[in-house]
Amino acid sequence: MWIKLLFFFTTLLVSTSGLGDDGITALLDPNSTEFSTVLPSNNSEKFSYMLASVKNMNMTASEFEEFIKVLKHRQSKDHSGEHVGNEHDESHGISVVSWHWDYVKNELVLTLFFIVIGLFKLVYHHTFVTRKILPESCCLIFIGIAIGFFFVGDATHASIKFLEFKSKVFFFYLLPPIILESAYSLKDRAFIENIGTILLYAVVGTILNIVLLAAALLILIWVGIMGKYNLSVMDILTFASLVAAVDPVAVLAVFQEVGVNKMLYFMVFGESLFNDAVTIVCYNLAIEFQTLPDFTWYHGFLGLLSFLCVSIGGLIIGLICGAISSFVTKFTTDVRVVEPVVLFGMAYLAYLGSEMFHFSGIIALIACGLFQTHYACCNISYKSFTSVMYITKVCSTLCESLIFIILGVMLVNEREWFWTDWHPVFSAVSVVLCVVVRFGVTFFLTYFVNQFTGGVRHISFQEQFIMSYGGLRGAVSFSLVFMISANPDVKNTMLGATYAVILFTNIIQGSTIKLFVKWLNIRLAKKEDHFRLFIEFNNGMVQHLSQGIEDLCGDKSLSLINRMSELSKKYVRPLLEKNYTANKAKKEGKLVELNRAVAMREALNNSPSQSSFQRQHTIDEMAESGALPHDLLDEEHQGHHHHGQVHPDNEDADQRANELIKDVSSIRQLMHNPFEDCYLDRNLTHEEEKEQARLKMKKTRAFKFSSVRKTIGFFGKKKSVRRHATQQGILHSAIATIGVQSVDRPSTSTRVSVEDEEQGLTMKEMEEEHPLMTITESEETSF
């Protein structure tokens, strides 16, 4: 029998050159009479004979299926090389120019899409009218709809095969960069102080949204207001779970443009991030409940345990991967280029590991990203930190844009129009209930937050309205509805309602959120910056008074966040941070640091060469917000000051300074030396050593500035006296600033600039010697 089978297999491989997947699938049923219609005409009789031979071999069904699988695998390999093979067969020589469209079609079109996304963002942000009317996500959906109409006649999707939505591609390639970039952006004091409120909205609020929305839909269906539908209780629960996912991309963009206060921004941002994780867990539970014959309270209890296990398991895996990445980056001083690889690799490993154990990959990725920003980023260099932040931002932006374009394409380029099987009443009621339930749950939970929790400050009615109105639906809801494996009628009903919810929230609510932010007079971050020093001083005084009262009463209580911070400083940071000491965080008072940042910001805003300091101003803001360690900031300052220093030789310092001031090319060379950015060492091994050497050399050169003065002695003998020239040293330190101002302004202003720079350096020395006096003067000025 095996000899016959081998002969049959060989003959079949030779004769399957024109056989498609449908033809091979037809062979799985030996009694099928339709296999001859899908086979080539010249091979029909041959396959009939071979099929009869298979029947005579007495093969079992499992053996036959295994044989067909091998045949399919062999055929796929043959077809994969068919294009190249045909070209080699047809070509009879060396071709100078050839056309390989089928070989690079998908990759080329995808690359063009990325370029189009970049050009669209450039045009969008330079078009004031479009940016004022529509959010960016709406414009991307419209672009996808236009592309879908262009290929609307292609029923097989062959032209836009790469734009077909696949849930695995979304959850393994498009969603992780978005979640990781969001996790990296959450390192802020406002997020840490409001973590309890954010989790309350994300966990309890999401569950309440699902339960209330499902209950309202069931009641309306039971009463008969919406008519009769073939939707079961579990189908309604699944639909409520998938439309509860919040994706406020447009809202956050408006918040950044308007400049709302940090508390409102991070509450909406953090709630939407954790909301996605809770929504996916609840959706998976609803899918598992559908497979049960009868739902009991015992199954509900198991579902609650599964929810806790999935969430806690993902949290543990994320923390473990974050700790490993932080520990590994302690030893990357000699190989700086691997630092981004370690951070990205461990973060993605946390996501995949959690999914492998059926835990929440989103929770694992959030935990790993937050852990890396607090510990691993303290070990990496400033260039690696900048690379990590920019790479995640670019990938996140591309993935978000591609998701919205795919949403628009699939809206009009489905196998059937989405409105052929949709129910307008069900979709309209779903949209209204999503908005109403969101408002009700937000106001209900905010009442308890304002009454019974120790929040940082009261959440006003205007902010509650914006938080409720900003509950847009997007990519997660769109992806989850495609994963439903119910009957076509049920899936099309849910798909049409989900499309209606996504389009309404993004187009209507996303377009009007900016108007509500302005009309409701939401508290902005700029108003808080004017009194920030006073607020910090007031909070510190209240905290010290509270500690004193607690000591007198004998009852000392610390919040959970403070206890976690103390444990981190005592045990975790010495283990995971490089060169960490207990007094590292206390080397400078908080008020002194904040006052220096405020003074620097005011000086940069009042400087006529403000545009030249735009990059440094951004670095200062990152350091103040905690996104950039101050040690890295000091290294950056060292690098910039080095550009302004000139090694004084034996020639006169004043003459050399005047030549530098008059020569624009020398000034530009001092401000930006292209050879400084080139690293011959690909591993960036000696980066920190170079920075330390530059700082040491700068201090050494400061003592070499001197001038020679000729005097006459008692007996008329001339002699030369060399002494330190402080004015010349200050002039050399100010060369960079003078150069920038000399390019932008006439040369008559250079003397004033020198005097301002000397005054600034004098104030800086006074501040270093008497920091308390500087704080007092700054406070008197602010009052």
Curated annotation (Swiss-Prot):
Residue ranges that the UniProt entry lists as topological domain Cytoplasmic: 130-132, 181-206, 257-262, 321-350, 446-464, 514-783
Outcome when changing residue 271 to Q: Limited Na(+)/H(+) exchange activity, low amplitude pH oscillations and reduced strength in pBoc
Segments for region (Disordered): 745-783
InterPro entries given in the database record: Cation/H_exchanger_CPA1 (IPR018422), Cation/H_exchanger_TM (IPR006153), NaH_exchanger (IPR004709)
Annotated tissue distribution: Detected in the posterior cells of the intestine.
Membrane topology, as annotated: Multi-pass membrane protein
Phenotypic effect of disruption: Loss of posterior body wall muscle contractions (pBoc), weak movement of tail, weak enteric muscle contractions, severe reduction in acidification of the pseudocoelom and slight constipation. Normal oscillatory Ca(2+) signaling in the intestine with unaffected defecation period and timing and normal locomotion.
Sections of the chain in a coiled coil: 649-702
Function: Na+/H+ exchanger which mediates the transient acidification of the coelomic space and plays a role in contraction of posterior body muscles during defecation. Probably by regulating the defecation motor program, required for fatty acid uptake by intestinal cells.
Family, per entry: Belongs to the monovalent cation:proton antiporter 1 (CPA1) transporter (TC 2.A.36) family.
Record's protein name: Na(+)/H(+) exchanger protein 7
